[in-house]
Amino acid sequence: MNSPATPASANGPTEPRIESISAITLATHDMPRAVLFYEALGFPIKFGGPQEAFTSFAFGDSYLNLIVDARAPVAWWGRVILYVSDVDALYRKALAAGLKPSFEPSDAPWGERYFHITDPDGHEISFAKPLR
């Protein structure tokens, strides 16, 4: 349902609706290594850095956060899917930085061009762009 907030009753308050994702926070046990990985992909640091316990990267209106947690790496839990302006250019950038994407960019039957990459802590990130 993509409807705007709807009234709870004719005279009552409106029901709240979820509007967007502000941030995704991923755990790392090695902040310097994780920061290098995300910087190599072009994520600009908004707060923190390699020697901090918390780092935030800004992209669009959202953030990708890293937090030091001794329990990392994690078991596979799913993936974060981020839209980018050019999937193939980002794939080439990853290769040039010595990173190892899971596969070459491909066109999916659901209408996106995409590839996956796994960060040093086992978090799977997908970079995608809708096909037009």
Predicted regions located by residue number:
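N-terminal beta-strand motif that seeds the catalytic metal site of vicinal oxygen chelate
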Residues: 1-35, 78-80, 128-132
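Core segments of cupin and vicinal oxygen chelate
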Residues: 18-19, 25-64
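Short polar/acidic secondary-structure junctions
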Residues: 70-72, 106-107
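Vicinal oxygen chelate
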Residues: 29-31, 80-124, 131
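Short beta->alpha transition motifs characteristic of CBS
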Residues: 24-27, 47-48, 67-68, 116, ...
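Short, charged/polar, Gly/Pro-enriched secondary-structure boundary elements
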Residues: 62-65, 74, 122-124
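Short acidic/glycine-enriched loop/turn segments that link adjacent beta-strands
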Residues: 51-53, 74-76, 109-112
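Conserved catalytic-core motifs of GNAT/GCN5-like acyltransferases
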Residues: 44-50, 106-108, 132
